């Protein structure tokens, strides 16, 4: 077996053949490969994978594909080298550790997305859009309503889903007002990122910190006021640039499908179980979410078994004239597995690739070197602010997972600061967060990368104000 591995290694890892077998490293100690061909190849494939993922719209290649392939190449290279040095088990255990962290994230997000798909399928989000239109709010009122709804909903719902929902509302009410669409979408992106930052149930980077048991669930709420400031400062300034007139009302009626309100209740119960299980039973968050998925599965069974065919007595006439059965008269089945299948698998697989790549770089030794540079030679506050600014163009979940793998020795106040800056820093650029990227793809006119850039100074002002607020009200955490 070693001979076969040696041949394979010689094909794409030439220096592995000449690695000394008597390296003096214990059987359980990771090898320092930062100055080895394996380390250099890890950096190369990391850069290639991320460049390809960031160029998704240009090269028309889904972002998950290069990330998953890059992570596979890097880990196979590492494992082959370790096997040649008689330490295959060390590399395998490191891989399994990173895989476990991903599986917990996967199950958590999978359940959350499944509930969101179920709500959308039952007409809840469409009903919200119609309700807002029928209330005849002015553009300025809608600017604040969509912003606050985005802020609140993002504490418990995926930021991408909330961003797309509120973006759809802004587009629907501002058909002939591209100026309103653009400024409302900027406000929505800022609100979503701010709202998801102080809740592990809504933000990926915050969820990572919670999963690693660095901070307790309740401690994140210390960021509620700083996050609110981050949202309000740019929103107040943008308010004066929003049109004052009122859009036309919608002629559509709200049609919620059977079971919609009960699904909302089940989602709330799921979140309560998740938090309670983590706080009092010390279970991982994924355990509570999977319990909630089981509830939704049984409710799906109940809806399917108790559904009544509501076709009217004139059904034969509809069929004869080739007319569709009116909404509300058709049989309303509910298939839970369709909702599971419709989750954002590209996003979930992207996170697999990102987390495994970051885990590999940590195992090779690069993240320790970066941690020494960031936190050893700089004050933690400066390091955390810089990392937060970098989230304007790098996914905040990936950055947080990288910092967690650096294992910096930080007080709770600095961990809260890092959570804050990474969460809200993505608002600075349209490509810095999932809601921004999602709206760029959804909105055809009014909201562009350049338009978002125009408001970056006021968003940066909110970023600075939120940091100052954190130091002011959370001094006891430092």
Positions of PLM-derived features:
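Hydrophobic transmembrane alpha-helices of multi-pass solute/ion transporters
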Residues: 43-114, 127-135, 286, 290-356, ...
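Structural signature of hydrophobic alpha-helical transmembrane segments
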Residues: 31-45, 100-111, 154-163, 223-234, ...
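Hydrophobic core segments of alpha-helical transmembrane domains in multi-pass membrane transport
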Residues: 9-14, 42-55, 70-80, 109-117, ...
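Membrane-core helix-loop-helix motifs of multi-pass transport proteins
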Residues: 2, 9, 176-265, 272-280, ...
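Membrane-embedded alpha-helical segments and adjacent helix-loop junctions characteristic
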Residues: 87-179, 341-409
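N-terminal secretory/membrane targeting signals
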Residues: 1-21
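Re-entrant/interfacial helical elements at transmembrane boundaries that shape
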Residues: 161-172, 185-186, 199-213, 295, ...
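C-terminal transmembrane helix pair
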Residues: 221-229, 349, 382-478
